[in-house]
Amino acid sequence: MIQGSAPGGLSRLPSNKLTCEICGMVCIGPNVLMVHKRSHTGERPFQCNQCGASFTQKGNLLRHVKLHTDEKPFKCSLCSYACRRRDALMGHIRTHSVGKPYKCNFCSRSYKQRSSLEEHQERCPGFHQGLPSSHLAENAFSKYGTTTERADWEHVIRPGQEPPLLDDSALLPTDVRLGLDPAIETQLEPGFDKLSNQDRFSNNFQAKRKSSTPQKVFGQKRMQLELSDIHYDQATSSLSERLHEVPGPVCAQTLEPSASVFLNTPSPVTRSAGQALEATRRLESESPGLPSDIGSIVRPVYSQSVDNRFQHDSPLSTSRSGLSQQPGRHHPSPGILGGSLGGICGRPAEAVGDSRPVNMPPGRGATSSPSNSCPDSTDTESSHEERSHHRTGSGSSTSRPNGSTGRPHRPEMHQDNGRLNRVSGASDSSSLPTYNVSGSDGEALRTYPCHHCGLLFLDHVMYTLHMGCHGFRDPFECNVCGYRSRDRYEFSSHIIRGEHLPTAE
């Protein structure tokens, strides 16, 4: 390619175009080439007198000066819009000429396409406050738009021209029914008009979603709309409130037997533990809004109510002097029954709060059955040696009459003053003081107590980490190094100090 020399030392092409000697860029004239070379040299000859900003072109400086004077010379003749740049005004005028017939009546935003309006209404807070669907049908999606929309169209349509019609295929079912006969409308499905606006727009939005919108968004929003009727505050709900939120089938199995316990009147239990387990599992699977530990709420109350059923209905005397048992007939022990229920339910029957009835003896609580994941879990105050001594020396006190059937001997239960207690006997988890923890706003906070150490946790994760420190066979055995503490104080000191025994690798 032959290049000629232009005046001023510029290299000119045969087509009378100039080229940059640094990067080879082709320019149509000397002024364009001069401005381009300033990008290589860094020269900015035009500088603002007020803020010191410099520019390569004078037009950029003049546009910048308007920022200081707040001057907006370009104004729209159809509305009050004003701007500093001509290209911005031209883009604004296109919104009037092209038109946005789909307008949201809750925030006055307009869109050119119906799908854009539906996508906006998924985020519009005013739309989700819930107005009647008839109001939306008559206003938001009327044939020619709302009155405000028609007034907007009158500025831009030509004389004698009809306003643009909305696509009939995009109308909602409610809009189609507006022209039906009233007698036919009464024969339609009663719940048709009561369909939520969110469901309608979500279905339509799924069919006309943009390719850039993830498909996963729809499933999450649908799930939130379907669970809108479930109101549950897990942080502030007490035991009684959580039990009242259990649906009817499970409430019938839990609250009816419990009522007989508080009224001290015998009531036969007609539902087995297997039915209670089945209903509880069905509740956990069908009600995702309920807490994940609903089984720990229902099962202790059910086991306690069956426990008291044998206390009232069986020939066993509940007097404080002792147990009178008919010879030749075996009666199941309440403690053993409660333990079997806890095993059947797949979760130990632990007490949630203080659910012991007022007329129940102090030594007998909702957690008198073997609980926790530790089979030998006993009182937190007793030492390991004392517990082993009780297990070896309580054989005479736990001997049963000859009339009893050959049930396996339970060394962890013993008879003491007419009551069946745990071996450690002295104190139970129900004898621990009950604390009500409140936040700064006065609302009750949910706590997670450790019945071994007497600690309260506000976070379930910290509670789980702490319970993992207790051993499986002995709660005061360190689950990290196997060190066996004498009491809870030594165990807490061992965990806090981190003085773990070296493990053989």
Curated annotation (Swiss-Prot):
Keywords: DNA-binding, Metal-binding, Nucleus, Repeat, Transcription, Transcription regulation, Zinc, Zinc-finger. Expression is strongest in the blood, gills and intestine. Its main location: nucleus. The keyword Transcription regulation applies. InterPro entries: Ikaros_C2H2-ZF, Znf_C2H2_sf, Znf_C2H2_type. Residues 393-406 have a biased composition (Low complexity). Residues 262-273, 309-327, 366-377, 424-439 have a biased composition (Polar residues). One of its GO terms (cellular component) is nucleus. The keyword Transcription applies. Residues 409-419 have a biased composition (Basic and acidic residues). It holds the Pfam family zf-C2H2. Residues 336-345 have a biased composition (Gly residues). A zinc finger (C2H2-type) spans 18-40, 46-68, 74-96, 102-128, 448-470, 476-500. Belongs to the Ikaros C2H2-type zinc-finger protein family. This is Ikaros family zinc finger protein.
